[in-house]
């Protein structure tokens, strides 16, 4: 039961981080600006309708609705570097830890700040659960050092990492 709860929190946290950090480039200038996306609703539905557990996953993810929601939640993670994925895993673990402590998500601006500057040390069991679930759920590789390096070390250097970028008239 505790594992199901943590898996549900992983899916919710991953989708929240992706939704908050989704970016679009302004036309003609090539500068990325953060814009809130409606992926939060899609990912919430994914969490409620499509189980992230490996046993049920093979049957549930075959439904076209689940496939679409999975694509909208996981595609941005596949588009960033492996180093950025490692940091994203830590960010997801931090969000889960805050949820377990009863803290609210706050405003998107606050989440972006916590992405680059963690305020709490993430328990290793939460990080391990994210490392075991997120890569397989989204079919992405996570660098080996993510499994051995504490999140506080990985995220000490702030990175400006857009989880997804669509550029019109310029480059990001």
From Swiss-Prot:
Seed storage protein. Not integrated in the gluten polymer through disulfide bonds, unless incorporated by reduction and reoxidation during dough making. Increases dough strength and bread volume, but decreases dough stability when added into a base wheat flour. Belongs to the prolamin family. One of its GO terms (molecular function) is nutrient reservoir activity. It comes from Triticum aestivum. Residues 1-19 form the signal peptide. CDD domains: AAI_SS. Keywords: Disulfide bond, Seed storage protein, Signal, Storage protein. SUPFAM superfamilies: Bifunctional inhibitor/lipid-transfer protein/seed storage 2S albumin. Contains 7 disulfide bonds. This is Avenin-like a4. It comes from the Eukaryota.
């Amino acid at each position: 039961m505790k594992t199901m709860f943590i898996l549900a929190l992983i899916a919710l946290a991953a989708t929240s981080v992706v939704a908050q950090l989704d970016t679009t480039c302004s036309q003609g200038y090539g500068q990325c600006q953060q814009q809130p996306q409606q992926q939060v609703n899609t990912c919430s539905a994914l969490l409620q309708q499509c189980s992230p557990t490996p046993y049920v996953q093979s049957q549930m993810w075959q439904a076209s609705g689940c496939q679409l929601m999975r694509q909208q939640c996981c595609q941005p993670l596949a588009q960033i570097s492996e180093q950025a994925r490692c940091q994203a895993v830590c960010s997801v673990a931090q969000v889960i830890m805050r949820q377990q402590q009863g803290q609210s998500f706050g405003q998107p601006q606050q989440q972006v700040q916590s992405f680059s500057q963690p305020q709490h040390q993430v328990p290793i069991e939460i990080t391990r659960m994210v490392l075991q679930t997120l890569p397989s759920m989204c079919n992405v590789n996570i660098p080996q050092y993510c499994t051995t390096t504490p999140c506080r070390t990985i995220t000490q250097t702030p990175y400006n990492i857009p989880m997804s970028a669509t550029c019109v008239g310029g480059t990001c």
